[in-house]
């Protein structure tokens, strides 16, 4: 799976280090390896996009290292592969030694895993499941400003799934903890890999059941009901949060217009 890059190799290049991505000119590099000074480097084939290979290269470039969010507006399939590259680069960087016996580890040749030659333990990339939910009450949707997003963006509620918890239980707990309300009629919508960090977003829609909004000030700045045709600043297109909001708006339009 891992090999030395040759002069004629071409494709999409996910050059990553410490969860950063090399974006010369603000774009994901595409073309022949020689044009990006990649010949002789180690590369891992992580997929294909539009008939061309996608390669992950673990390397820190002095300039143009940015965030994966900068390519969020590209095609979802390419964004997903770039996210895979970042997560794999971070996985290999953080698993050089075995967590059980402390001996050095090496990469598997048959799968994305790290192996310990001493105790035979096998490690796989960490994936953190999260829930994200759009909550509707009549013609309105619950939107909140998160403390970590002080840019005026209002979005739906989300959170990590805890150990020993189902996705449904996670939705009920997160909604109650952050907003103080209860929900009903939970429906699964879609999922999205989201490497900020190593998350798998599982998206739901739900209906308001009971309770008054009581904001968890540790997590949220504000939370309120917004009529579907009078919404504040929203997350960018391409995010699963935006998808949930747009789906809720479409349902409201169909019912109230």
Swiss-Prot record:
Q: Which residues form a coiled coil?
A: none
Signal peptide interval? none
Q: Where is the Nudix hydrolase domain?
A: 125-248
Q: Which GO terms describe its molecular function?
A: magnesium ion binding; manganese ion binding; NAD+ diphosphatase activity; NADH pyrophosphatase activity; RNA NAD-cap (NMN-forming) hydrolase activity; zinc ion binding
- Binding positions for Zn(2+) per the UniProt entry: 98, 101, 116, 119
Which UniProt key words apply to this protein? Hydrolase, Magnesium, Manganese, Metal-binding, NAD, Zinc
Q: Name one Pfam family in it.
A: NUDIX
Q: Give binding positions for a divalent metal cation 1.
A: 158, 178, 219
**Residues given in the record as a divalent metal cation 3 binding sites:** 174, 178, 219
Task: Give the cofactor binding note.
Answer: Divalent metal cations. Mg(2+) or Mn(2+).
**What EC designation does it have?**
3.6.1.-, 3.6.1.22
Q: Which InterPro entries match?
A: NAD-cap_RNA_hydrolase_NudC, NudC-like_C, NUDIX_hydrolase-like_dom_sf, NUDIX_hydrolase_CS, NUDIX_hydrolase_dom, RNA_Hydrolase_NudC, Znr_NADH_PPase
The family assignment reads: Belongs to the Nudix hydrolase family. NudC subfamily.
Q: How does it assemble?
A: Homodimer.
What is the protein name stated in its UniProt record?
Answer: NAD-capped RNA hydrolase NudC
């Amino acid at each position: 799976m891992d090999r030395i890059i040759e002069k004629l190799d071409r494709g999409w290049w996910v050059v990553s280090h410490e969860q950063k991505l090399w974006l010369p000119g603000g774009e994901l590099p595409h073309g022949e390896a020689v044009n990006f000074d990649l010949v002789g480097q180690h590369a891992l084939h992580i997929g294909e996009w539009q008939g061309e290979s996608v390669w992950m290269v673990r390397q820190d470039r002095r300039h143009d290292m940015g965030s994966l969010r900068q390519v969020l507006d590209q095609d979802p399939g390419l964004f997903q592969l770039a996210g895979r590259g970042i997560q794999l680069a971070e996985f290999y960087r953080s698993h050089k030694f075995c967590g059980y016996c402390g001996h050095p580890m090496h990469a598997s040749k048959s799968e994305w895993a790290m192996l310990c030659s001493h105790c035979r333990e096998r490690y796989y990339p960490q994936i953190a499941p999260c829930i994200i939910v759009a909550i509707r009450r009549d013609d309105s949707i619950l939107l909140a400003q998160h403390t970590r997003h002080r840019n005026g963006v209002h979005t739906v509620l989300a959170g990590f799934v805890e150990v020993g918890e189902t996705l449904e239980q996670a939705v009920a707990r997160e909604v109650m903890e952050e907003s103080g309300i209860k929900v009903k009629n939970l429906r699964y919508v879609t999922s999205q890999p989201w490497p900020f960090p190593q998350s798998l977003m599982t998206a739901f829609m739900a209906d308001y059941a009971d309770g008054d909004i009581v904001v968890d000030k540790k997590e949220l700045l504000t939370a309120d009901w917004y009529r579907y045709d009078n919404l504040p600043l929203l997350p960018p297109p391409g995010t699963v949060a935006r998808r949930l909001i747009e789906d809720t708006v479409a349902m409201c339009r169909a019912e109230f217009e």
